[in-house]
Amino acid sequence: MKLGIVESAYMRYGISEGAKKAKEHGFECYDFGRFIDTETEFFKLPEEEFKAELTRIRELVQAEGITVWQAHAPWRFPPRDATPEDRAERLLDMRKAVRGASYLGAKHFIIHALMPFGSHSPDNPELMRDINAEFMAELAKEAVAYGVEHINVENLPFPGLPLNYTEQCLEFVKRMNKETSSDIFKVCIDTGHSNACGESPADAVRMLGKEYLGALHVHDNDGTRDTHWLPGEGTIDWEDFSNALAEIGFEGCMSFETEVPNSVPLGVERDRREIELAEIGKKIIKRI
């Protein structure tokens, strides 16, 4: 099992210097989050410039021993997925992000379900699932074409949605693999989302098993809010989570979707806190 973290935790130092520091602290992989906001100058770059910049990032971080393991899909809130036109526009951005993941060398693409009826419980849950199935099937074609191995459907912190809990995501992923005659779809467990919705992240891991657990977003909270705290600051049972990963033989990346707070200035104290976070990660994946 590998140890990863969001790239924003170390990009503040510069691409090469940040990757070097991440590696020195004990991390091996990045979770790339710069595709989330599609309104940035970066995301709006023409395709060739977009590809060149991401290829440059990949080469620089790889030179320091860091692999971009996974990339997060575009995400906007409040959601704007209500009309076919909204979803067509979103699909264009998603396809570009999948290509971006490919340019980075990332094999895992992590996506939230579309919310065509908002983040509350829809009147027609089956229609929501069908809309997502049609959308995801189209996105899978781009992933296959560009060598991105898995689209990971992430559990969410919106209890009313029919694609929120781990079990719901699992059933959807099984449906998508059947409909696409593939095994491209897996589930990303977000530990904070699970905890905020009353699910045990460890039990979610056991439910999916090695076959369906593709990626992880690891962080903590108080069981009610999606606060992205560091592990140990909230109520998640990390020993049970660690044991669950070992039980199923997970071989992917245990990736933190959290980082040392921005309030901690650069220097000795921040280095100490970042190393501590890596040590927590090593304990979870049972390296120490």
What is the predicted function of each stretch?
Residues 6-7, 44-46, 85-86, 127-128, ...:
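A generic structural signal for short
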Residues 148-164:
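Hydrophobic, aromatic-enriched interface-forming segments
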